[in-house]
Amino acid sequence: MASLKEDIVIQLQRISTICKLKAPVVVVWCMTYNHANYIKDALDGFVTQIASFPFIVIVHDDASSDKTSEIVREYGEKYPDIISPIIETENQYSKSDGSLDYIMKAAIKATGAKYIAMCEGDDYWTDPLKLQKQVDFLEANPEYGMIYTKIQRFYQASGKLKEIWGGNHESFSDLLRENTIPTLSVLIIRDIFIDYQKEIKPEIRDWKMGDYPLWLYVSAKSRIKFLSKVTGVYR
C-alpha cells in the first residue's frame, strides 16, 4: 500500500488534535460515496444524538463526483465538535490495496475513543438516544463486547419503510447459522475491533460477506447483546 497523501495526513492530524481536547467516548465511522441525495439524513441522525458523553463522527467521503463532499463540509463547519470530515481526492475503494482500511484504522486510533459505531452515508439513525442506551449497557456490563438493535428497511422504488429486521441472535453458534446483525445498529468496544483487524487482517481476504466475520469474532471473544428496539433505517 502506498503511503498516505499529505492532505489525508493533515486531516488525520486535525482529528487527533480535536480528540485530545474532546476525549470522545464514541467514534462513529461513516463511509460515503455519491450519497448526495441521502447523506443529510445520516448527518442529521448523528448531530441529533443526545448523550451524556462526548462523541465524534468521522465522515469519509471517497472522492464523490456529486455534491456529497460539499454537504459533508457544510455539516463539518456547522457542527465542528461532532462532524470531522475526511475528503478524498481519489477513490480509495477502487484501489483494492488496503488503503481504505488503513485510513479507517488510523482515523479510529487517532480518536482514542472506547467504542465504535458505524453507519454508511445512505443509512441513518432514527433514535436520538441510540448511543446513550448502548453505552449505558456496555458500561454496566463489561463482559459484553458489542450491542446491536433492530432497524427498518427503506425501499427506494416505492419510497416506503417496510419490514423491521435485526436480532435476536447473540451467541457464536446462532450467528454461525444466520447473520442477524445490521451494521448501522452496532456499538462495539474499540479494543476488540482493533484485535480483529490485527489478528484476522480482513483487508487481505477476498470475503464477500460485509461485517459478518467481525460479528463472529466478537461473539467468540466476548458476549453480544441484542436490544429489541428500532434505532435506524437501512436503504
What name fits each language-model region?
Residues 24-27, 56, 213:
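Cell-envelope/extracellular polymer assembly enzymes that use nucleotide-activated donors
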Residues 89-111, 133:
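Glycine-rich, basic loop-to-helix element that forms the pyrophosphate-binding segment
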Residues 116:
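Short aromatic/hydrophobic "clamp" motif used to bind/position activated sugar donors
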Residues 40, 66-75:
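Acidic helix N-cap motif at the loop->helix transition within catalytic regions
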Residues 128-161:
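Conserved donor NDP-sugar-binding/catalytic core segment of glycosyltransferases
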Residues 61-70, 90-91, 120:
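A conserved acidic beta->alpha catalytic loop
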Residues 149, 165-235:
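Conserved nucleotide-sugar donor-binding catalytic segment
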Residues 1-48:
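N-proximal low-complexity "stem/linker" segments adjacent to membrane-targeting elements
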